[in-house]
Amino acid sequence: MTKTELLGVYRTSANHIRLTYASLVLWAYPDTTDFFEELYSRMDSIPKPFVDLPTLLRDDRAMRVACEELYESAHRSALNGLFPLTKLYCQETGQLDKLKAQPWFQFWRILRNCFAHDMRFNFNRDEKSLLPVSWSGVTIDISMNGKPLTNGQCSREKLRELFESAQSFITNDVA
């Protein structure tokens, strides 16, 4: 993978988060559900695999939960997918030590493992030896072992900051 290709994956991930946000803004508008149902009913040429979709769209509580999860999953997906690609690129270009020296590297690594394994912290021996790890005012420590990650522990704003820090590192600090 080239640096240009890796930065392309970062851009695609950022666009995924942005598009998800734009979708949530649209769903927050009171008339969006009516507009969607009218448009959807006229679109005969597209598959409609979710017959219960209008019911979901009219259920305020279910929509709130679904929208929150959609936004969360866009952030998790970006950070979960980019970590191994970033690490692989740095390893293949002889810059892994530079990556590991970043103040957010171990934090991201442990957070990514949480994302990839049921959204719970299940620290392995190596991770336990590194704890506590802190980055940007957020600390992951041994007391979190076996517990789920919550938005209160690491907000979407912090996830975006982590994403932007890693993207800036690839853009500016590696060859």
Give residue spans per PLM region.
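Amphipathic, Lys/Arg-enriched alpha-helical patches that create a basic surface
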Residues: 3-33, 71-91, 130-175
